[in-house]
Amino acid sequence: MEALCAVGWHGSPFYRVRVPVPCPAVEPTDLALLVVRIMFGVGLFFHGYNKIFGGGGLAGTGRWFASMGMRWPALQARLAATTEISCGLLFAAGLLTPFAAGGMIGLMLVAAWVAHRHNGFFIFRKGEGWEYVASIAVVAWAVATIGPGQLSVDDAIGVADDWDGWRGAGIAAVLGIGGALTQLAVCYRPAR
């Protein structure tokens, strides 16, 4: 028996009958993509939120960035927090998914290079290795490639199929890698 989502009206203005409206089929992969998007998107959102409201706030985040060799640390702290919050929310909602994924990839590549690469691969190593941030980048790229699924804003507005597959993979990779390389080239000046 088909599940019913709502009751609609059918007929003319003079004669209308209430009829059941079947639910659209939701595949297990759509539910899995929703869970992945929410987990990683909300997680990234809270990283950005913490940069603003946690511990030392933006000033503390800026000092931390300066200690790693980032130029204009106050600006970098604001940009990182804003990007984490906005891309996290967009990714969780499945809105502009490959663009949000590109922002996530860029953030994670910069974090991997600046904060984690000297600590090895594993996150449990002292100073935390680059395993975790690389995993986030790979998940973001995979979701951009697969598409956000039916349970997404992109699907609801009819653009999900336009941006998945190679197009989604390309958008996310170019934005992420290009953004990370640009930021590192312009802003990263480690002590020698």
Task: Please give the residue ranges for each predicted region.
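Extended, low-polarity transmembrane helix blocks
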Residues: 2-56, 60, 74, 78, ...
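Hydrophobic, membrane-inserted alpha-helices
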Residues: 82-92
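Perimembrane loop-to-helix junctions flanking transmembrane segments
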Residues: 62-72
